[in-house]
């Protein structure tokens, strides 16, 4: 996989994830209108139902939407470095409940707005490589008191991989170290190389380096309380090789 280091380090593709440890939230606060109205749009508030057949409590619904929006923000931040997180500017079109108790909640999200004025397209001009997707897709798993969400620009999640785990310590430094160790262990196996490391780009997004060379593998990290999660996006040729392995 050494050829990955020759790919341009700033691909249009991205990834975003988030994680919420429900035991570290306060349901009585989450269900106050003055709290959830800063997260849910009017349409999202009106669209809430117990999400049959599993009757998702309202506070869980709020944090599910938060998780989706945070993951969307992380996805878009890599493409639009100046983007500022604003939950009410990210609109969830719909959330489809899972077909079984261990399945995914699936959400469709309108493309996050770009900062500043939007210029009309010039006829015949190509779209910029880093323009936001018209829609993003989220898959969220709610299990063992944690919400884990991953976002992709294709509904099949082709080339996007993710994982999560629990840790013993809720300390921020331990969370941060553990999730990086978890992701690097996965990538070292997938890419068959041991010279990988993580650092942040100028916008604060994590990037993968092989030695000193940035790789075209977008990654996203999340941690909360005693839980950690990651997602990453492989280039098309690498994803195909991974599926064939």
Which stretches of residues belong to each language-model region?
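Core catalytic alpha/beta fold that binds nucleotide/phospho-ligands
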Residues: 1-245
